[in-house]
């Protein structure tokens, strides 16, 4: 009976360690300061081209309004993909995961993510944090 309990406890601890390791796969790709006026050239350039399968957006400071986003891949043709993003993100709010590389070509790496948008309801600039999952 003691060995069954020990085995069960070991499996439970292994499961916890497994899940925490997966949670650490999410990486902050960068933070963008959102101006007060609508801007369509806000770019997050990744210094090292990396495979990113999905992203989350968080309004770290202030509310922001987004009108578009695109992902650019390192490829001979400079391929890109428009993203379906929410139009507003309130301070402290995080979006659901937004899938990229949806054409099943998971070998393309992301070199740049661009955004169009601005800060709303604040005299300070809002900040947009981009979290990636590979």
From Swiss-Prot:
It holds the Pfam family DUF2541. InterPro entries: UPF0412_YaaI (IPR020240). Keywords: Signal. The keyword Signal applies. It comes from the Bacteria. Belongs to the UPF0412 family. HAMAP family: UPF0412. This is UPF0412 protein YaaI. It comes from Escherichia coli (strain SMS-3-5 / SECEC).
